[in-house]
């Protein structure tokens, strides 16, 4: 059924609509995921294939497809929605590649040439190489850096600043030939610009420009199985919105799509899927994980959840392209008939479906409810009370995975990982929307021959050695830049530090202009 449905999408999309998706693969760590600029992620819908593979090159997938849902009301209570469950381009998508522009600009060659492929892939190593060589005679700026969409075209009605970049001379212009470079997170990132206004607008869209940065780290711990998402929604409309809702829809397929369960953990802002039995068989052309199948989750690092849970019954009916009212109700914890979700154990209304831990029999889960496993879809939603014109809602997510034990042990470990990531995120205080957070890159950072951290990853006790560095102090900062430790190191070339009391996560050790990343496991 899964394959037949997606093939139907592919046929319809290819047959009717000119605007199609452009794809990139993010595969720097143990995850290989497909991304596009038409409102979908982790999917290859036009080929009818799942798009989130872990382990990489194994053929095993945990997510079939994902998409963005956005809704809000104006001052009179009128609803505006941009949402589609399966985005395959054209009418099958709520978002389309490129930034908001003047209405007359979308059909021009200038817009098509600039944003026909509104998706860009870049690595930290490419940036470091560019920093070291941009002043060298004969150096050619690589395409990944030269094509970075730092500035918009004013003559097309596009905002002057688009994707974040480091502006060395502070003139507001992205000039890679003069040393400017993309401002990314992670070891590798894919940046996507989309809007809900350019393709056959019906008056019900919000006028939102969506900027998504997916990024990964290659490490020796759980981050090697994690993909991060920084999402910026920019209100380019002439309206002030109220009761803003933003959701991620996910069609989970843990190998075999027909034997899964879904749950959520509001305290850790987490939605997750796990196998409904102990063996994940291959079925329907999809490879199963076999014994001890994994748990796959997604958590919101930046916002508490408004609602989360499995889509069931009429909430999950069909694959229609317009289901604005149903999507809005779901994002507000309601059924398609406007009734509120109910927790059967407490007989009270709830915003969170199956919010119990399946390892605990007295909590509300699909296990304790004796639900038959099956094909599972879910969503998690965040909210903002007010979304003014020209303002930005910035949110951060992490897609986490574990297969270290049996199917229910893996659920607990995903919950543990989510808690560790959330603690690490929150320990950094406020997180600026445009901050790279995890890596402030300069041409003198991350030089292993001059500053060495061992062991790395570490359980807490680390040994530092350095040479040819003139500095009086050693500093340790969180991934958000907050200073948490400082030590005088004058006339020293080595020291031992115990950071075992800190939350698990990523930290940066800096001596002078030299920096090393350390992972506390």
Each predicted region: which residue ranges?
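Bacterial Sec-dependent N-terminal signal peptides
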Residues: 1-23, 438-441, 508, 515
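Intrinsic low-complexity/disordered segments
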Residues: 2, 13-17, 41-43, 470, ...
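Residue-level detector of intrinsically disordered/flexible regions characterized by low predicted structural confidence
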Residues: 4-7, 270, 277, 441, ...
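Intrinsic structural disorder/low-complexity segments
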Residues: 5-8, 231, 390, 519
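C-terminal outer-membrane/trafficking sorting elements
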Residues: 6, 444-521
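A long-range scaffold signal marking pre-active-site subdomains of enzyme folds
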Residues: 19-434
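Short clusters of hydrophobic/aromatic residues that line enzyme substrate/ligand-binding pockets
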Residues: 174, 441, 472
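Low-complexity, Pro/Thr/Ser/Gly/Ala-rich linker/spacer regions in secreted
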Residues: 430-446
């Amino acid at each position: 059924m899964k394959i037949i449905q997606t093939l139907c999408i592919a046929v319809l999309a290819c047959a009717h609509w000119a605007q199609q998706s452009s794809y990139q693969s993010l595969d720097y760590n143990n995850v290989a995921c497909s991304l596009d600029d038409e409102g979908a992620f982790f999917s290859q819908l036009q080929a009818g294939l799942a798009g989130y593979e872990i382990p990489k090159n194994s053929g095993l997938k945990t997510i079939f497809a994902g998409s963005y849902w956005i809704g809000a009301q104006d001052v009179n209570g009128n609803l505006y929605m941009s949402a589609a469950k399966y985005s395959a381009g054209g009418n099958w998508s709520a978002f389309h590649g490129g930034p908001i522009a003047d209405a007359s600009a979308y059909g021009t060659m200038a817009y098509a040439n600039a944003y026909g492929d509104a998706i860009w892939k870049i690595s930290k190593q490419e940036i470091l190489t560019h920093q070291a060589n941009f002043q060298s005679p004969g150096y050619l700026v690589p395409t990944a850096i030269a094509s970075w969409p730092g500035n918009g075209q004013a003559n097309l009605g596009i905002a002057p600043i688009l994707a974040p970049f480091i502006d060395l001379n502070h003139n507001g212009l992205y000039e890679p030939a003069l040393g400017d470079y993309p401002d990314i997170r992670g070891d590798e990132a894919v940046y996507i610009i989309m809007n809900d206004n350019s393709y056959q607008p019906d008056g019900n869209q919000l006028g939102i420009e969506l900027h998504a940065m997916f990024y990964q780290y290659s490490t020796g711990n759980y981050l090697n199985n994690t993909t991060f998402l920084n999402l910026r929604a920019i209100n380019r409309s002439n309206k002030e919105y109220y009761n803003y809702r933003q959701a991620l829809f996910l069609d989970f397929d843990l190998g075999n799509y027909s034997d899964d369960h879904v749950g959520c953990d509001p305290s850790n802002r987490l939605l997750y899927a796990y196998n409904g039995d102990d063996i994940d068989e291959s079925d329907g052309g999809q490879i199963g994980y076999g014994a001890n199948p994994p748990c796959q989750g997604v958590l919101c690092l930046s916002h508490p959840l408004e609602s989360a849970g499995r889509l069931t019954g009429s909430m999950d009916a069909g694959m229609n392209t317009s289901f604005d009212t149903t999507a809005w109700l779901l994002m507000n914890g309601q059924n398609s008939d406007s009734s509120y979700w109910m927790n059967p154990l407490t007989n009270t209304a709830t915003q969170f479906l199956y919010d119990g831990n399946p390892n605990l029999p007295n909590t509300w889960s699909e296990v304790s409810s004796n639900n038959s496993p099956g094909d599972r879809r879910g969503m998690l939603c965040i909210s903002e009370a007010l979304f003014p014109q020209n303002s930005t809602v910035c949110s951060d997510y992490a897609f986490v995975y574990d297969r270290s034990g049996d199917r229910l042990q893996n659920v607990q470990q995903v919950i543990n990982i989510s808690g560790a990531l959330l603690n690490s995120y929150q320990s950094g205080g406020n997180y600026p929307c445009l901050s790279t957070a995890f890596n402030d890159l300069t041409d003198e950072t991350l030089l292993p021959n001059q500053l060495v951290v061992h062991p790395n990853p570490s359980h807490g006790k680390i040994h530092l050695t350095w040479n040819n560095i003139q500095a009086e102090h050693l500093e340790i900062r969180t991934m958000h830049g907050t200073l948490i430790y400082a030590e005088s190191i004058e006339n020293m070339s080595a020291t031992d530090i115990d950071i075992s009391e800190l939350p698990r996560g990523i930290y940066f050790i800096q001596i002078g202009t030299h920096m090393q990343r350390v992972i506390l496991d």
